[in-house]
């Protein structure tokens, strides 16, 4: 009988894993970071500021983001579990992977993880462990807090202000004012251009009618 195939079949069908079954009887307790804190290696400076001060296997990647990875029991290969929004979500993902890889020898962040989380059987593939870790983290996603609600309100208020400004800019009243300013400038331009044009000749001007053809067009204002 193929043991690995049977374990995979049990996990896919939703059958509780042996780890969870043993945890229900309460025969023995798992180690946790509070009862058996992990030893910190000396000389490591790269991750000192990014490692979580309490949770095992959790590091800060960016502001507001936490990453988690675990090491295989008998090897140097690490299993990347993903990036999470909170440190608790990453810590729950770590517990699932640690239980799947080490069983009773796992050091957990939470004592209730074997009871509350769905753990794949020991010997599961890396992909199965990642999927179980993602499900566990999602189950502990916190609800939106007040700060997120305040941010959404501020964004909505900013959008309303921009919309009002656009409505005022497109109002017909402002278009009329712009047209009036244009007409005023055009009037000044017409006046400046008119000063450069000679005035029309007046009646009785000696200069008028000096030509031979001008007599026919002369207008007599007074007749005796």
UniProtKB/Swiss-Prot annotation:
Location in the cell: Nucleus
Biased composition (Polar residues): 1-16
Keyword Transferase applies: no
Pfam families documented for this protein: AP2 (PF00847)
SUPFAM superfamilies named among the record's database cross-references: DNA-binding domain
Domain of life: Eukaryota
Gene Ontology CC terms: nucleus
This protein's UniProt keywords: Activator, DNA-binding, Nucleus, Stress response, Transcription, Transcription regulation
Span list, region Disordered: 1-46, 139-161, 200-224
GO MF, one annotated term: DNA-binding transcription factor activity
TM segment ranges: none
The entry's DNA-binding region: 54-111
Family named by the database record: Belongs to the AP2/ERF transcription factor family. ERF subfamily.
Function: Transcriptional activator that binds specifically to the DNA sequence 5'-[AG]CCGAC-3'. Binding to the C-repeat/DRE element mediates high salinity- and dehydration-inducible transcription.
Protein's name according to its UniProt entry: Dehydration-responsive element-binding protein 1G
Organism name: Oryza sativa subsp. japonica
């Amino acid at each position: 009988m193929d043991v690995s195939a049977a374990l995979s079949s049990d996990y896919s069908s939703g059958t509780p894993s042996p780890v969870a079954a043993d945890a229900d009887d309460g025969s023995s307790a798992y180690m946790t970071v509070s009862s058996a804190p992990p030893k910190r290696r000396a000389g490591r400076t790269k991750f000192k500021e990014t490692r979580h001060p309490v949770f095992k296997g959790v590091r800060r990647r960016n502001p507001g983001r936490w990453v988690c990875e675990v090491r295989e029991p008998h090897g140097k290969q690490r299993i990347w579990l993903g990036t999470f929004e909170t440190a608790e979500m990453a810590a729950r993902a770590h517990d699932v992977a640690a239980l799947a890889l080490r069983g009773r020898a796992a050091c957990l962040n939470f004592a209730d993880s074997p009871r509350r989380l769905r753990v794949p059987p020991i010997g599961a593939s890396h992909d199965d462990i990642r999927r179980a870790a993602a499900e566990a983290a999602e189950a502990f996603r916190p609800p939106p807090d007040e700060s997120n609600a305040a941010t959404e309100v501020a964004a909505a208020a900013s959008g309303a202000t921009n919309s009002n400004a656009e409505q005022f800019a497109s109002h017909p009243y402002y278009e009329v004012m712009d047209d009036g300013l244009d007409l005023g400038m055009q009037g000044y331009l017409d006046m400046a251009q008119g000063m450069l044009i000679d005035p029309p000749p007046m009646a009785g001007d000696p200069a008028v009618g000096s030509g031979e053809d001008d007599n026919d067009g002369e207008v007599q204002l007074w007749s005796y």
